[in-house]
Regions:
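A short acidic, Gly/Pro-enriched loop at the edge of an enzyme's catalytic core
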Residues: 136-152
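Conserved SAM/SAH-binding beta-strand->alpha-helix loop
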Residues: 85
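Conserved class I S-adenosyl-L-methionine
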Residues: 55-64, 80
């Protein structure tokens, strides 16, 4: 079974996207507060608002349970969130409908705390819609890709695709000239998700190390790399187990 369709992962991602820092960060480790709210920070810190036209249109690929899509709606009048997981999209649609996320935070074993967290009231949820779709085959989804987007946001996606290069090759047609592409990834290349032959980086080529950022620059000739930034993030599994990672965020402008 796809792990992203399980109750466990849906609950963990709702917590990851919608919980307050105090609900995620373990007591006594205040320095980890900066690793919370990743779905918000990947937009708030990386979106180049001065480059946005009026009535900007955004595509959030691999939106998971949707918090980054709602954050994009602060600045864009239309936002389409797309994810391969039907459960994630159902959860995102439920938040859009109600204005809040309900989920259980695992404490230990079957012990859990029920939480309900509201979206900020100033976010216009009507600007956002969610669709299931395959990031590697966006042309077959129900979104209007031919109209182009002023922003494409893909957070922690590329190292979970079986063929990330196929996703990258769609981007020139997706992003309007002058539009921006926001990518984040910890570059955790694993054969569980991506055959090694399809990794973008993390290997030697003719005895020379190849990094993912270097490969992105090679594979995105229609884009200008504007900036990069390290964005730490924290995923809480239960009260005594956490995943701490550092994503590299990069912003690219369509030539």
């Amino acid at each position: 079974m796809n792990p992203y369709e399980t109750d466990k992962l849906v609950a963990e991602y709702l917590l990851f996207h919608y919980a307050s820092p105090e609900q995620v960060v373990p007591p006594g480790v205040p320095e980890m507060m900066a690793s919370a709210d990743f779905a918000v920070r990947s937009v708030a810190r990386m979106l180049q608002t001065d480059l946005l036209p009026r009535n900007a249109r955004a595509l959030d690929v691999g939106c998971a349970v949707g918090r980054s899509s709602f954050e994009l709606a602060r600045h864009c009048t239309e936002v389409v969130g797309v994810d391969f997981s039907h459960r994630f999209i159902a959860a995102a649609r439920a938040v859009k409908e109600s204005g809040y996320a309900e989920f259980n935070r695992c404490e230990e074993g079957h012990l859990a705390t029920a939480l309900r967290n509201f979206l900020p009231s100033e976010i216009d949820r009507r600007r956002v819609r969610f669709e299931t779709g395959d990031a590697m085959h966006l042309e077959s989804s129900s979104i209007r890709i031919n109209d182009g987007f002023d922003v494409v946001h893909a957070a922690n996606l590329i190292d979970r695709l079986s063929d990330p290069l196929r996703f990258l090759r769609q981007l020139p047609a997706l992003v309007k000239p002058g539009g921006q592409l926001i990518l984040t990834s910890p570059y955790t290349w694993l054969e569980d998700y991506t055959p090694q032959a399809n990794w973008l980086g993390g290997f030697y080529e003719n005895e020379r190390p190849v990094t993912t950022l270097e490969r992105l620059q090679r594979e995105l000739p229609d884009f200008l790399l504007l900036t990069t930034q390290d964005l730490p993030f924290l995923i809480r599994e239960h009260a005594r187990k956490y995943q701490w990672s550092i994503a590299q965020a990069s912003v690219w402008v369509r030539r």
